[in-house]
């Protein structure tokens, strides 16, 4: 699996550079994303602009990974879905379970709001 990682102040922007995210890549996906939970900056924005197909098993894995981030008080936002991937996720009923934004900028806004929310609930 090809990825590009850009580290920002409050999150890591990870771009999947493979055209297909398939079931046989779920373990590799977890191995790529879950270690970020051990870093000081835990938040992840997953950019899927180069991915034209995500099968159901890979999508279910993304939902589980996202839940793992939220269980560990970190944000996980997916952005820049291609229309085909968005339709596929919607048809499978998984899109509504995911934290998805159209752009990386909006993903940053979500992370910022979730950080404020976590601070308020921890007081």
What are the residue ranges of the model-derived segments?
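STAS-typified acidic loop motif
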Residues: 2-37
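General small-molecule cofactor/ligand-binding pocket signal
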Residues: 6, 79, 101
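Residues that form or immediately flank small-molecule/cofactor binding pockets and catalytic motifs
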Residues: 10, 83, 105
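Structural signal for conserved beta-strand scaffold positions within catalytic alpha/beta enzyme cores
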Residues: 15, 100-102
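Amphipathic alpha-helical interaction surfaces in cytosolic regulatory modules
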Residues: 26-98
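A charged, well-structured terminal subsegment
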Residues: 102-123
């Amino acid at each position: 699996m090809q990825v590009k990682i850009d580290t920002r102040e409050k999150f890591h922007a990870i771009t999947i550079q493979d055209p297909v995210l398939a079931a046989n890549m779920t373990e590799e996906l977890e191995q790529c994303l879950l270690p970020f939970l051990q870093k000081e900056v835990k938040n992840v924005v997953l950019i899927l602009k180069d991915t034209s197909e995500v099968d159901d098993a890979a999508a279910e894995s993304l939902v589980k990974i996202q839940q793992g981030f939220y269980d560990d008080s970190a944000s996980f936002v997916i952005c820049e879905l291609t229309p085909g991937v968005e339709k596929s996720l919607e048809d499978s009923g998984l899109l509504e379970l995911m934290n998805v934004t159209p752009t990386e900028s909006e993903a940053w806004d979500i992370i910022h709001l979730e950080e404020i929310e976590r601070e308020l609930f921890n007081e």
